[in-house]
Amino acid sequence: MLCYVNYKRVKRPVEIPNLEVEIGFGRGDFIVKLAKENPDKNFFGIEISQISIEKLMKRVGKKGLKNVYCTNVDAYWGFYFLFRDNYVENIYMNYPDPWFKKRHHKRRLTKPERLYMFAKKLKLGGEIRIRTDNYEFLEFTKESAKVLDCFEVEEGTLNVKEPLTKYEQKWLSMGKTLYKLILRKVKEPKFVEHPEVEEVRELFPVKVKVESVDPKKIESREIKLDEEVYFKTFKVWQRDKDFLVECLLSEKGYLQKFFIQIKRKEDGYVIDVSPYSEVLRTRNLQRSIQTVAQLLS
């Protein structure tokens, strides 16, 4: 398996033994250090920044590391799609965004439904190890852990001889207090309502019997398909009698950007996801195709 794991294409759940995961690896200093010091283990980085992904891949290639993997996706969905329950040995979160404003707390990495997903995938005895410079974030995380009732909690201030990153080194040199929180899984978490998407084996094109296509009917539309499920269209391109529609689907926070093609056939048009769009096949993606067909009918 290559360093970069395309979660939409790879066989899931992944089969990578002795696996530890870092969420939000940034420059990649920590995950590379772990991989070099522990050649008998495998390390998986999950990161939403494409630039960070590319930088890590270059570093891994230059150092010849064979035990580092990464993917470009939101951490919750990375765990949801890629790992089976009780599989990951340890999870690392180094200075996650604390999202200071109260109205943004729902974006925090350790809100209960996200922490629930991480706990489900963590082995019994495994640990979620968090470093933060924000004490309020630490307290928030402890409250989320209480909801799940599956962790032994250990906390304290950091006193490190070897900083993980240049930022940690800078903060320590400034005398800033840094905190650590270890959540050790001792039993299965209590159930918490959490986002899910329904995958399907295949997507089916939809045929509409119309003489012509009016782009204004489908351009710049926003349609609610279900609770917390929204389908948006943007620009429409035309080439001869065929069309290409720029689209976005948001399912419980899981985002997919793709194109829908509208191709002329003898007695109408066939609507399908463009073969150049890489998508995760979901029930709501099929509904998106059907929605475009309805707009044209």
UniProtKB/Swiss-Prot annotation:
The active site is at D97. S-adenosyl-L-methionine binds at E22, E47, D74, D97. Substrate binds at K101, D133, T165, K166, Y167, E168. Pfam families: Methyltransf_4 (PF02390). Disulfide bonds: none annotated. It is an enzyme of class 2 (transferase). Its EC number is 2.1.1.33. GO terms for cellular component: tRNA methyltransferase complex. Pathway: tRNA modification; N(7)-methylguanine-tRNA biosynthesis. GO terms for biological process: RNA (guanine-N7)-methylation; tRNA methylation. GO terms for molecular function: tRNA (guanine(46)-N7)-methyltransferase activity. Belongs to the class I-like SAM-binding methyltransferase superfamily. TrmB family. The C-terminal region is probably involved in protein stability. Catalyzes the formation of N(7)-methylguanine at position 46 (m7G46) in tRNA. This is tRNA (guanine-N(7)-)-methyltransferase. It comes from Aquifex aeolicus (strain VF5).
